From Swiss-Prot:
ATP binds at residues 7-20, 96, 152, 175. It comes from Streptococcus pneumoniae serotype 2 (strain D39 / NCTC 7466). Belongs to the TmcAL family. Gene3D superfamilies: HUPs. This is tRNA(Met) cytidine acetate ligase. It is found in: Cytoplasm. The keyword Ribonucleoprotein does not apply. GO terms for biological process: tRNA modification. GO terms for cellular component: cytoplasm. Pfam families: HIGH_NTase1 (PF05636). It catalyses: cytidine(34) in elongator tRNA(Met) + acetate + ATP = N(4)-acetylcytidine(34) in elongator tRNA(Met) + AMP + diphosphate. Catalyzes the formation of N(4)-acetylcytidine (ac(4)C) at the wobble position of elongator tRNA(Met), using acetate and ATP as substrates. First activates an acetate ion to form acetyladenylate (Ac-AMP) and then transfers the acetyl group to tRNA to form ac(4)C34. Its EC number is 6.3.4.-.
Length: 365
């Protein structure tokens, strides 16, 4: 049987995600971001709620991406996620993308010329942002042109790089309906961005979300809920360069901007430059909020939930892969667990995220 991996945030889970799971084949394993997202934002609803939504709509097994995998630029995010799915035995990786290309061919190209391609990126001027450098590399070596704003396509290329040289087939699925950043309401499939923006519009949610009741009952947070905490962390830290990935230039810009910024959005606007994209700045602010330091990734994989089919698969991995299903005295990943505690500060009503939590079990398949 095919074992398909899917890398996801489900922020929140919508009909487009359900479509992706429906199109994927065989046993479906999802590696999902925890409570903070790849572009440096808190998840609108917590990881357990999102895992439950996925399991109710076609996923067989949901595991959590550690914080230092989930909040990263596309390449590291892709690499770390594929590493985890590879250990769980996937032979195919399904993903949504705006452009359906021969991603397999691109992966093969990277297998063959990876070193040369990375050298090309290293030699590009530092005035370019990392995404611009990556795009220049794909243009040079694969003749790819980037049309406007297509984050899923950028991630898809990161996945192609990550599976290079591994025994994993790529299964691109054309994105249906609204674009990633679209807030349009008159479409067949709404984007997660639109759902976050129209979260109080019940008719809209019911049209585009399969597990709408779960979403409506859950505590919801936005970046602004953490702004006072972020401000405190910036003001009370004499040397921001001790924080993961924060360099001197960024430390100075952030310290200056916090004097006048009245919101996270304003802070991001003030700090962003041509070279440092908004997503990168949001990631740095997330690292500062968490006081993140460089640390090793956890050996074990944290299981958030499974169906009967998923449980059987986990059983077959026993002894080969280190799995954590209950977090007790021994931490699974100290960094991610600290992040979860800070996430809970966003709203007093958010449930405990780790201690005493056990994987969600969905009995029917």
């Amino acid at each position: 049987m095919t074992i398909t991996g899917i890398i996801a945030e489900f922020n929140p889970f919508h009909n487009g995600h359900k479509y992706l799971l429906d199109q994927a084949e065989g046993l479906k394993i999802v590696a999902m971001s925890g409570n903070f997202m790849q572009r440096g934002e808190p998840a609108i609803v917590d990881k357990w709620t999102r895992a439950q939504m996925a399991l109710e709509n076609g996923a067989d097994l949901v595991v959590e991406l550690p914080f230092l995998v989930s909040v990263q630029a596309a390449d590291f995010f892709g690499q770390g996620s594929v590493d985890i799915l590879d250990r769980l035995g996937i032979d195919s990786l399904a993903f949504g993308t705006e452009e359906v290309l021969d991603y397999q061919k691109i992966a093969d190209l990277y297998t063959e010329k990876g070193a040369e391609m990375e050298k090309f990126v290293k030699n590009l001027p530092d005035s370019l942002s990392y995404p611009q450098k990556t795009q220049a590399m794909w243009k040079e070596f694969a003749g790819l042109d980037f049309s406007g704003n297509t984050p899923n396509h950028v991630l898809a290329l990161a996945y192609a790089k990550a599976v290079a040289g591994r025994n994993i087939k790529l299964h691109p699925i054309q994105r249906q309906g609204a674009g990633y950043h679209s807030v349009n309401k008159d479409v067949d499939f709404a984007s997660a961005t639109a759902l976050r923006q129209h979260q109080k519009d019940q008719d809209f949610l019911e049209r585009f979300m399969p597990s709408v009741a779960l979403f409506e009952q859950a505590s919801k947070v936005i970046w602004e809920d953490y702004f006072p905490l972020l401000r405190y962390q910036i003001l009370s830290n004499p040397d921001l360069t001790t924080i993961y990935q924060v360099n001197q230039e960024m430390a100075v810009r952030i310290k200056e901007a916090i004097k006048t910024a009245q919101s996270v959005e304003e802070l991001v606007e003030l700090v962003t430059t041509k070279r440092y994209t908004k997503a990168r700045v949001r990631r740095l602010l997330t690292y500062i909020l968490m006081q993140a330091r460089e640390s090793d990734l956890p050996e074990a994989i944290h299981v958030l939930g499974f169906t009967e089919k998923g449980r059987q698969h986990l059983k077959s991995l026993k002894g080969q892969v280190s799995l954590v299903s209950r977090i007790g005295k021994e931490p699974w990943d100290a960094m991610t667990q600290k992040v979860d505690q800070i996430y809970q500060l966003g709203k007093p009503s958010i449930a405990e995220q780790n201690f005493g939590r056990v994987p969600i079990r969905i009995e029917t398949n």
